[in-house]
């Protein structure tokens, strides 16, 4: 997972695997 996706998911409350 890239930094941008991780940031968005963190804000959304979703953790990408």
From Swiss-Prot:
Keywords assigned by UniProt, alphabetized: Secreted
Keyword Signal tagged: no
Superkingdom to which the source organism belongs: Eukaryota
Tissues in which the UniProt entry reports expression: Expressed in skin glands.
Coiled coil: none
Compartment(s) of residence: Secreted
One term under GO cellular component: extracellular region
Family the UniProt entry places it in: Belongs to the Frog skin active peptide (FSAP) family. Septenin subfamily.
Summary of the function given for this chain in its UniProt record: May act as an antimicrobial peptide.
Name listed for the protein in its UniProt record: Septenin 1c
Provenance organism: Osteopilus septentrionalis (Cuban treefrog)
Lineage, top ranks: Eukaryota, Metazoa, Chordata, Craniata, Vertebrata
